[in-house]
Every structure is written in C-alpha cells, then in structure tokens.
Amino acid sequence: MHLARYPRRFIAHLPTPLERLDRLTAELGGPEIWIKRDDCTGLSTGGNKTRKLEFLMAEAELQGADMVMTQGATQSNHARQTAAFAAKLGMDCHILLEDRTGSNNANYNNNGNVLLDHLHGATTEKRPGSGLDMNAEMEKVAEKFRADGRKVYTIPGGGSNPTGALGYVNCAFEMLNQFNERGLKVDHIVHATGSAGTQAGLITGLQAMNAQIPLLGIGVRAPKPKQEENVYNLACATAEKLGCPGVVAREDVVANTDYVGEGYGIPTESGLEAIRMFAELEAILLDPVYSAKGAAGFIDLIRKGHFKKGERVVFLHTGGAVALFGYDNAFDYSGRWVA
C-alpha cells in the first residue's frame, strides 16, 4: 500500500519506540507486555493525534488555508496537538472546547492542555456539554470567519476522518515492521478508542497487510454498539480511500466499553490505579481521560485471564499525560511528604 500518494507533512518523531514492560509483566503475572510509545511523537508533548495531523494539515496547506479550526473536550489532546501543528506551519488556530464534565476546577479549565493551546497561539471558545453536534457547531463558526475573508480548514474532533485515519494505517505498517525486525510474534494489540480514527486506521492497515493480530479498543465514551459502528464505518471509508474496499469485516472491529465509568473525562478508580502502576513500575505517564481507561481495561482483562500467560500483547499508548495537570484534584499524595 503506497501511502506516499497522499500529501503529508512530516513532523512526528517516527518510528515511536516499542518497549517491553518487564516490571508490569511481573506484577500482573499474565502475558508478556509491550508498549508502543505514541506518547513520544514529539509535537508539544506528543500523542496519537500528531500522526493524523500529518495528513490533515498537509491537506489544509494544499487548499490554501490560513486558519485551521477543530473541536474537542476541555482537556482535548487533539486540540493541543492541532494548535501546535498550526503554530509550526504559521497558521492561525481556533478551537471550540466542549464542557463534557461540568468541572469548575480552575486547573481543569485553564491548565494542562488548555494552557498549551494558548501557549501555541490558539484562540478558544467554550460550548456546553449539552449534546450539541460539535462538528456542525464548528462549521457555523468557520462560516463566520470565511465571511471575513479567512480560508478556514476544519478538522473533525479527534482528527477522525479518512484523511486523518491514514496516520494509523501508517502506524499499523510501522508496528508490523518493528515486530518483524525484532522477531516478535504479537498475539494482541490493545489501545484506548474514542473518536474512532486510531482504531479505524489500525484495523484497516492490519487487515490490508493480513497481519492476523486481533485489535481491541477500550472505549472511553460511547456504548459498545455505537463505538463499534463508528469505527467500522470509518474503517470502510478509509479502505475506500486507499482503494481496497471490503478489506475490513464487521467482526474485525471489537471494542470493550466496560471501563468508561461515570462518563467521558471523569476519572475512574481503575484508571487512577493504572496511572499509578504505569508511573511507579515503568516510569510511564498516562492521562485520566484516554490512556488510563484503556490501560485499566487492559489490566483488568489480564487479571481475568482474557490474555494468557505466554502470549505477547502490545499496548498502544496514545499519549496525553499533560492532562494530568488539569486533574490534580484526583490525586492525594500528601502522605508522601516527610516531615
């Protein structure tokens, strides 16, 4: 599959590392655990959205855009990476941030990703978390800018459309190359799934290469039927864009949404445990919104025997640790101070 046919802005630090997690493996006593470090993509603390933005921002440039616009939750990693990419290319960036948690915490609303949005020069405006179609809302705002003569390129939440998903088709190829070069037979790949683009791109790439590695997305927002439908539809559209329609079957798309908790962006006890385990055992930082819930599901499934001893499982780290600074009230380490 020849991805060089599609315009791309090479910004990410690729390939990202593939590391074995010896201490976490020993702690859980299950499969051999590896991690794909897409928290190390390089742009403004890294994260998975940079892969998508390489293709999306190249398209924006080709269309002559002088402004990009996107939307996401208050502590959106995607928004932060979009703002950073726009700064790198000399474009203006405007972001609609949806209040999905109702939190009044000052750090949640002004620190973490929000601070970096503004440091990168983006302008932001808020929307209530009342079930708005945020992509439609964004298009309304974009039309106002266009009426003033701006050339606006809009990017859907999470960068999740067929163009953005190409970034994770490429990631699938990258991982398979790493597995092959190191002689690693991988039995499963697990990651957090939200706006669908990461999982859709991965499954399209894996199926196109006949990898025969099951992919499991741990959901962070939508119920299982809706999440799987979103991923499947986007995977089909991505395969169509690539010229290989039908490469992804419905049964190839699997999501487990048992670890969402009270809702999107609201920390869970299992997610906080995952953050502590990864930090204390492997010096790896997760975020409470995406990667921690993905890791929580992964850990629980290991404990339940879903992944067997002797298997090799890769957890794809989607990044986002900067959001920890917006969730400081979720942690109490006062007992770590020694008088």
Curated annotation (Swiss-Prot):
- The reply to whether RNA-binding figures as a keyword in the UniProt entry is no
The record's section on InterPro entries has:
ACCD_DCysDesulf (IPR027278), D-Cys_desShydrase (IPR005966), TrpB-like_PALP (IPR001926), TrpB-like_PALP_sf (IPR036052)
The record, for Pfam families, names: PALP (PF00291)
Native organism is Ruegeria pomeroyi (strain ATCC 700808 / DSM 15171 / DSS-3)
Q: Which family does it belong to?
A: Belongs to the ACC deaminase/D-cysteine desulfhydrase family.
- The protein's name is L-cysteate sulfo-lyase
Task: Give a GO biological-process term.
Answer: sulfur amino acid catabolic process
In the induction comment, the record states: Expressed in cells grown on L-cysteate, but not on acetate or taurine. Cotranscribed with cuyZ, with which it is likely to form an operon.
| Cofactor annotation | pyridoxal 5'-phosphate
Q: Which residues carry this modification: N6-(pyridoxal phosphate)lysine?
A: 49
EC number of the protein: 4.4.1.25
